[in-house]
């Protein structure tokens, strides 16, 4: 499997174009996204942290061993309810995760490719993936930096 960073709509359009050109394609499996395409900025890291902390709080330590569908679904619904209530979490900069994205993050957490860490500075828990495309450690400290607090720069 190759992670391209393309949206589902773009991939479907490519498939349609190839089929229109006479190629026959057999999809072996559904695409599976991960930290490399989902966590690419401090805003996406804030959202992943919120979603996965809710998931962990609901499912407990068992979510580190297997994906708990009921806990993930409940966390996902709570995540979207919180997004609706927080001013400023709208627009392209704050693109929401879908349920497939939530499953992918939960799978990374289960496999050990991702973890919840506690920031030494602000004591907030945040989600981090070994595959993420951002050097942001604690996204909450970075967000505080935008409002006058200290911000840790990437090395």
Predicted regions and their residues:
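Long, charge-rich, low-complexity intrinsically disordered regions
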Residues: 2-155
């Amino acid at each position: 499997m190759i992670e391209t960073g393309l949206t589902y709509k773009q991939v479907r359009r490519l498939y349609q174009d190839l089929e229109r050109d006479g190629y026959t394609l057999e999809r072996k499996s559904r695409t599976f996204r991960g930290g490399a395409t989902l966590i690419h900025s401090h805003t996406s890291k804030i959202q992943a942290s919120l979603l996965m902390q809710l998931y962990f709080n609901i499912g407990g330590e068992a979510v580190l061993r297997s994906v708990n569908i009921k806990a993930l679904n409940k966390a996902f619904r709570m995540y979207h309810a919180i997004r609706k209530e927080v001013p400023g979490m709208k627009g392209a900069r704050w693109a929401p995760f879908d349920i497939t994205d939530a499953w992918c993050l939960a799978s990374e957490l289960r496999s050990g490719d991702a973890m919840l860490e506690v920031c030494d500075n602000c004591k907030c828990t945040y989600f981090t993936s070994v595959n993420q495309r951002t050097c942001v450690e604690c996204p909450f400290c970075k967000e505080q930096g935008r409002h006058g607090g200290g911000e840790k720069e990437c090395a």
